[in-house]
Amino acid sequence: MLFKIYIRILTFLSNIIDQIGRLLMWRPRPEGVKNLLNIRYGDEKWAKYDLHYQDNGRQKPLFIYIHGGGFVSGDRSVCRYYCYEYAQRGYAAMNINYQFAPEAKHPDQLRQIFSAIEHLLDRADEYNIDASRVVVAGESAGAYFSTYVAGISKKRKYYKYFGIDFKYADTFSVSACVLICGIYRLKDALYFRFSFIQSYFRALTGKTFSQMRRIYDERFFDKFSPLNLVDGSFPPSVIIHATHDSLKVESEFFADRLDLRRVPYLHYPAGGIASRHAFPINTRCGDGKRGLEATVKFLDKYVNKAEERNENV
């Protein structure tokens, strides 16, 4: 009971920070971009997503965004302006909410995210979505879930492993990832000097830090570590980290894994105003904007089959 109260206080404070971030990132809806807000993919109050796209009759690749918030907080509205950037560039940008821990434990959120994706794919023709071109993206906890979505789409046995009932399991395949300030290894991350990280993982796993320290079965940690799904089949990826983020080692380790597996990737360190955790999604600041431009060029090459461009930044 005390832990749930603590998480509620933490969530309240996180939501205040999120709203400040939303104000800092605010921009008007771009001309020609249509907003469909609060689309329900389930009966629960959190089971909603938004769709941002240009209603021009052209086929559009799908850009799926999953927000962060330490597994216990956050809201898709904070990331709306980041999604606008992709809608402007011809994507159908989907922005998903999911249920928070500790009420939902891993892999509940994965099941919910795939349920939202299924709901939209059922309507792909209505919005002229090209389901053969899919980008999945997220920041912080959203990058954690995005890695799972991408990895599961390539290693389909994990649908059954995680109990995911997904109508499009045989055909859905992620073309590229955009992973911002993510976390990918449970066992290592528990010891990082990142505020409240042990509480976040307690909420997600149902285990205290002391309990997890006494677990010697690596299969427990594997279940909560999306890096285990990363092999040569993983899609081309953009890895963005903030230079003053105590989690940046996770992005560096992830990039090394992609390099080892010979997966095409772009690794972009964001500095300046964007140098703090999750700040690179603010495209109004210098390195946030430059990171976006580099990301778009990378996606043009691997998703939109554009002319090869220089990946170095």
Where are these regions (language model features)?
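Alpha/beta-hydrolase superfamily serine-hydrolase fold, recognizing
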Residues: 1-313
